[in-house]
Amino acid sequence: VSYLQKDSALEATYKDYADMAFVVFHRSGGEGHDNPRTMKWNGKSVTDRDSAGEANQPVPGARSMDDHYLQLDQNETDLLAYVCEKFAKVTVILSSSSQMEVGFLDDPKHYAYHDNIVGGMWITGTGHEGAASVIVGETSPSGRTVDTWARDYKLDPVWMNFGNNLVEGSYQKKGNLYANYATDDGYMSSYRGTYVIYKEGIYLGYRYYETRGYTEGLD
């Protein structure tokens, strides 16, 4: 269910700044706050406990239970479509310490794509302090991303090892739980008690994509 609300009084002011619109999408995350890899909801929190029949609905505002936190949800998709309908030029600003899936910027097949999207800015944590200077032309950024951005995180090799493992699968075993205060059966006292496995070593991000063909062949 989308929570997009239209305001006719606000819409009447659009003509005063019709040259371009900016849409800001925010994500939080960091050490001790891994981004959820599922939008399964038990009515109170994100969960993987399907066996108990708890995760039987998507997070409020999500498109699907199979989506993840770094995708645009239904609210954001509807908002972006609405703004693109009202403005001929739209720039998306990403206020996030984590890279989001941004295929909607240039992929016509993406569910959130629109022809009126003309650009995107990634301002990360403190970038908001200089974003206005970039927008008005006082500062000229490099125009390049600082890493390789995946179009589909579920196809990224680190997907199976990263985060709090709130996705069902063969990897969701006892070995993925760090038992520093385990119960008698070897599990943590909390099902969220997981840890990140960096099996890729230093070959994260662009290092993986730039070296995979050399170390493993083109296939």
Model-derived regions: residue spans:
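C-terminal non-catalytic regions of proteins with extracellular/luminal or membrane-system context
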Residues: 1-219
